Design a protein with these regions (language model features):
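Short conserved micro-motifs on helix faces and helix-strand junctions that flank
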Residues: 22, 85, 102, 116, ...
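Hydrophobic alpha-helical transmembrane segments of multi-pass inner membrane proteins, especially
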Residues: 1-90, 128-188, 212-213
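A juxtamembrane structural motif centered on a specific transmembrane helix
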Residues: 181-216
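Re-entrant/interfacial helical elements at transmembrane boundaries that shape
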Residues: 31-32, 110-114, 145, 188-197
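TM-adjacent membrane-interface loops and short helices in multi-pass inner/ER membrane proteins
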Residues: 76, 80-123, 127, 134-138
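Residue-level recognition of specific faces of alpha-helices
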Residues: 97, 114-117, 146, 156, ...
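P-loop potassium selectivity filter motif centered on the GYG triad
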Residues: 1, 99-107, 199, 207
């Protein structure tokens, strides 16, 4: 790929990222950048160039770009037990939901955590509710469903004859699956809280139809 064309292609993306970052909405910034990088790499772009950019941007973001509450999210993620009734409450209750579910779960609609203890049970922590009601088996099924979407989307991209269609299929597939897996990682305490809901499953009118439009 022509490096000059690459730079110009990333200019509008970086402008959008900058505007979103000032809101601030770091989770949407992460999603937009991750999807753009995935499309760039699949188009034959240089992974080395991406690594250089990450080595430059990540330290700057950590040192200067994070707001107080965003830094607090990282600290809470590392040590939720330090403030179990405050900042660490959400993630602790999420893990309690998973533990309560065990292998097979407590049954559909029988979650106790979602009734009073687990905040945002219908959006950010819907995966924890699934874990409590349907257990490890239910969680594994959700992973398999998103993995199937990922596999089928990439297969469509491979079979596509033109580059635009190929990259469009890759971008939409990556965007859906990245959000899905990111939601799972947050609920499981593998990454700090991001506020990203799970496609097709989390509550939300336009959000729900938006992703079905992606699939169509």
């Amino acid at each position: 790929l022509d490096n000059e064309k690459i730079i110009w292609a990333f200019v509008p993306i970086l402008i959008m990222v900058g505007l979103i970052f000032t809101q601030p909405n770091l989770s949407m910034v992460l999603l937009l950048l991750a999807t753009s990088v995935a499309i760039y790499i699949c188009a034959g772009g240089s992974i080395q160039l991406i690594l250089y950019g990450m080595c430059t941007m990540i330290p700057l973001l950590l040192l200067k770009g994070l707001k107080g509450y965003q830094s607090s999210r990282i600290t809470t993620w590392l040590h939720p037990e330090a403030d179990p009734l405050g900042a660490g409450y959400n993630i602790i209750q999420s893990l309690v939901a998973f533990a309560s579910g065990g292998l097979y779960g407590v049954g559909y609609g029988s979650s106790k955590q979602k009734l009073a203890w687990l905040p945002e049970a219908h959006t950010d922590f819907i995966y924890a509710v699934i874990g409590e009601e349907h257990g490890f088996i239910g969680c594994l099924l959700i992973i398999c469903l998103f993995w199937t979407i990922l596999q089928r989307g990439f297969l469509i991209a491979v079979k596509c004859q033109d580059m635009y269609g190929k990259l469009l299929a890759l971008g939409l597939t990556f965007s859906i699956c990245f959000q899905g897996f990111l939601n799972m990682w947050v609920a499981s305490s593998f990454v700090p809280a991001t506020g990203v809901p799970m496609p097709f499953i989390s509550y939300g009118g336009w959000f729900f139809f938006f992703f079905f439009f992606f699939v169509l």
